[in-house]
Amino acid sequence: MFPLNFHYEDVLRQDLLLKLNYANVMEVPGLCEIRVVPKAPYNFIIKNGKLAMEIPCGQKFIQTQRGSTGKSFRSNPFLGSNKDKGYVSDLARQSTLRGHGMSNFLVRILTVMSLLDFPVEIRKNSIQFSMETEFCEFSPELEDHFEIFEHIRGFNVTIITSANTQDETLLLWSGFLQKDEGETQ
């Protein structure tokens, strides 16, 4: 288990239980997933996007098969498929992280955010921010592949939580940031 998971289970979850006055520990909000979308031109994403997203996210992409009926939401131009090039949304180019991959990526995000100042937008059940290419400078595994990232203008990151209100999301996010600050001091 990652230290961030221990922090959530042992410290943050109990703190939120008391602050939000919940009767049941299962009501306490947690992290569900992290969505990462590269800010790059469409033609770059087709050619190099798969590799550019695999390296920082730490997970291998798999090609999904399109169903036989009509347009499929699983048709993913980000993976280099030649299907349905008419409409491409950000959802078609995103990487979704859950479980250990999410925890590992969140540790990296918190480390970079403690060094740089990224504006964060906190909503009802999500935390959104844009990471510029400086993220690459703080990740040793990315420095070896800078030619892939030189055309990416950064990443849009959305952290989805199970919170019901913006205040719950804010408390959850500030708890993770305090954990990171506590380790660096």
Curated annotation (Swiss-Prot):
Q: Which UniProt keywords apply?
A: Mitochondrion, Ribonucleoprotein, Ribosomal protein
* Domain of life according to the entry: Eukaryota
Where does this protein chiefly localize? mitochondrion
The residues forming a coiled coil are none
Instruction: Tell me the Gene Ontology biological-process terms attached to this UniProt entry.
Output: translation
Q: Which GO terms describe its cellular component?
A: cytosolic large ribosomal subunit; mitochondrion
Q: Where in the cell is it found?
A: Mitochondrion
Q: Which GO terms describe its molecular function?
A: RNA binding; structural constituent of ribosome
Q: Which PANTHER family match?
A: 60S RIBOSOMAL PROTEIN L11-RELATED
State the remark under miscellaneous: A stretch of 270 kb of the mitochondrial genome is duplicated within the centromere of chromosome 2 resulting in the duplication of the gene. The expression of this duplicated gene (At2g07725) is demonstrated.
Binding partners and assembly: Component of the mitochondrial ribosome large subunit.
Which family does the record claim for this protein?
A: Belongs to the universal ribosomal protein uL5 family.
Q: What is this protein called?
A: Large ribosomal subunit protein uL5m
Q: Which organism is it from?
A: Arabidopsis thaliana (Mouse-ear cress)
